[in-house]
From Swiss-Prot:
Keywords associated with the record: Cytoplasm, Exonuclease, Hydrolase, Nuclease
TM annotation in the entry: none
Family to which this protein belongs: Belongs to the XseA family.
Cellular localisation: Cytoplasm
Name of the protein described by the UniProt record: Exodeoxyribonuclease 7 large subunit
Length: 449
C-alpha cells in the first residue's frame, strides 16, 4: 500500500511551494476589510501588522515602496480596506497577506464602488471617444449646473465676465453634496435639455474629499451626462480629482475656472484676429485691383493698336507713298520721253527728213497723250479704290456701329457677350457705348423665344 502512494508524497519544501503557487495563481489580488493590530515598523521601513475581525485574523506585510504611498499613519484598532496579494512564506509555512495599498475603511469602500462603476460604464462604452460631442465654437449661451452659493460658481462667472462679458449665462442651481445632490443634478441636466436655452453646459463644483465629490460618481449623474444632447464640460474639484462624470462628459476641465476659459472666447484675441484678417483682406484687395488695372491697361493698349482710325491712317500713309512713287515714275518717263524726243529731233535736224520728223512728232504727241491719259486713268482708279476702302472701313468700324445706337458688352475677363448663356444673375458686365463705358450687374437672364 505504501508503494502505491509514493508518487503522491511531498517534501515539506515542495508542499509549501505548491501551496504558495496555488494561492498566488488562484486567488490573485483581493480587497480585504479588517481591524489593524500588532502594527510594527522596523528600521527597514516595512510595515508588519495583523488584520482581524470578530472571528479570525491574518498576518500582513506592506513593503516600503508600497506603504510610502499611504496618506495616513495606521493606528492600532483602526478599520482599513487593503488591496493585497495572498501568498505563503515557505520557510515557516506561514500564510500571509502582502498589501499593495491601504485606505481608511469608509473611503476605501467608496473607492471600491468607484472602481466597480468605472469598469461597468467603460464596458458599456459610455467613455468611448466616438460618443463625445464637439463643443460649439463660439458658444452663444452657457449653462452652469452647480451650487448657487459655492466658490465654483463665483470662479466661473468671474472668468466669463473677464473674457466675454456679452456671453449669456443661465444658472441651474443644485445641491452638489449630500444624498439629494445626484437627483438634483440629474433633474438640472434634463431641464437644461428640455428648455434648450444653452449650447454648452458646465457641470461641476469646487474641491473636496472623495465623500464630498461622491455625487459626481453617481451612476444616475453619469447616465444623465451621457444622454445630454447639449455638450457637457465637467469641472469637478481640482486637477487631481477625477470623477466618473469626467470620463462620461464630452470634455473634462481640471477646474471650474478652466471650464469657463474653455467655453468662452477671449474678446481681445478675437479683436486681434479680426484686425489681422482685415489687414490681409486689404492687401489682397490692393493686389487684386492692381492686377486688374494692369490687365485693363494692357487690353486698352491692344485695342488702341487695332482701332479702325489707326488702320485707316496706316493705309492712307501707304497710299500716299504709292502716289508719290507713281508721280516720280511719271516724271521719270516724261523726262525719258523728252530726252528721246530731243535726241530724235537732233538726229532728224541733222538728217532733215521733214516728213519723218512730222511723223515722229505726231507719234510723240500721241504717246504723250496716251501716257497722260493712262496716268490719269491709273490715278482715278487708285482714288476710287482708296475711297471704297475708306467707305468699307467706316462701315465695319465698331465706332460707326456704336454711333448708330448699338452697344458692345463684355464679361469681367474681357470676353464679348454673344449669347445669354455666357452670364447668369449676379454677374458683372461692362458695356461700351459711343462715348464711354458703363458697368452693370445682371439681375435676370431670359432666353429669347
Amino acid at each position: 500500500m505504501l508503494s502505491s502512494q509514493t508518487s503522491s508524497i511531498f517534501t515539506v519544501s515542495r508542499l509549501n511551494q505548491t501551496v504558495r503557487l496555488l494561492l498566488e495563481q488562484e486567488m490573485g489580488q483581493v480587497w480585504i476589510s479588517g481591524e489593524i493590530s500588532n502594527f510594527t515598523q522596523p528600521a527597514s521601513g516595512h510595515w508588519y501588522f495583523t488584520l482581524k475581525d470578530d472571528t479570525a485574523q491574518v498576518r500582513c506585510a506592506m513593503f516600503r515602496n508600497s506603504n510610502r504611498r499611504v496618506t495616513f499613519r495606521p493606528q492600532h484598532g483602526q478599520q482599513v480596506l487593503v488591496r493585497a496579494n495572498i501568498t505563503l512564506y515557505e520557510p515557516r509555512g506561514d500564510y500571509q497577506i502582502i498589501a499593495e495599498s491601504m485606505q481608511p475603511a469608509g473611503e476605501g469602500l467608496l473607492q471600491q464602488k468607484y472602481e466597480q462603476l468605472k469598469a461597468k460604464l467603460h464596458a458599456e462604452g459610455l467613455f468611448d471617444q466616438q460618443h463625445k460631442q464637439p463643443l460649439p465654437s463660439p458658444a452663444h449661451c452657457v449653462g452652469v449646473i452647480t451650487s448657487k452659493t459655492g466658490a465654483a460658481l463665483h470662479d466661473i462667472l468671474h472668468v466669463l465676465k473677464r473674457r466675454d462679458p456679452s456671453l449669456p449665462v443661465i444658472i441651474y442651481p443644485t445641491a452638489v453634496q449630500g444624498d439629494d445632490a445626484p437627483g438634483q443634478i440629474v433633474r438640472a441636466i434634463e431641464l437644461a435639455n428640455t428648455r434648450g436655452e444653452c449650447d454648452v453646459l458646465i457641470v461641476g463644483r469646487g474641491g473636496g474629499s472623495l465623500e464630498d465629490l461622491w455625487s459626481f460618481n453617481d451612476e444616475r449623474v453619469a447616465r444623465a451626462i451621457f444622454a445630454s444632447r447639449i455638450p457637457v464640460v465637467s469641472a469637478v474639484g481640482h486637477e487631481t480629482d477625477v470623477t466618473i462624470a469626467d470620463f462620461v462628459a464630452d470634455l473634462r476641465a481640471p477646474t471650474p475656472s478652466a471650464a469657463a476659459e474653455i467655453v468662452s472666447r477671449n474678446q481681445q484675441e478675437l479683436l486681434r484676429q479680426i484686425q489681422s484678417a482685415q489687414q490681409r483682406l486689404g492687401m489682397a484687395m490692393d493686389y487684386y485691383l492692381a492686377n486688374r488695372s494692369r490687365r485693363f491697361t494692357q487690353i486698352f493698349h491692344r485695342l488702341q493698336q487695332q482701332h479702325p482710325q489707326l488702320r485707316l491712317a496706316r493705309q492712307q500713309t501707304a497710299l500716299e507713298r504709292l502716289r508719290q512713287r507713281m508721280g516720280f515714275a511719271l516724271e521719270a518717263r516724261i523726262k525719258q520721253a523728252t530726252q528721246r524726243q530731243q535726241r530724235v529731233s537732233q538726229r532728224l535736224s541733222q538728217q532733215n527728213p521733214q516728213p519723218r520728223i512730222h511723223r515722229v512728232q505726231s507719234r510723240i504727241q500721241q504717246l504723250e497723250y496716251r501716257l497722260t491719259e493712262n496716268i490719269r486713268s491709273r490715278l482715278s482708279e487708285q482714288r476710287e479704290r482708296f475711297g471704297n476702302a475708306v467707305t468699307h472701313l467706316e462701315a465695319v468700324s465698331p465706332l460707326a456701329t456704336l454711333a448708330r445706337g448699338y452697344t458692345v458688352s463684355t464679361t469681367t475677363d474681357g470676353k464679348v457677350l454673344k449669347k445669354i448663356k455666357q452670364v447668369k444673375a449676379g454677374d458683372i458686365m461692362t458695356t461700351r457705348l459711343e462715348d464711354g463705358w458703363l458697368e452693370s450687374e445682371v439681375k435676370s437672364v431670359t432666353p429669347g423665344t
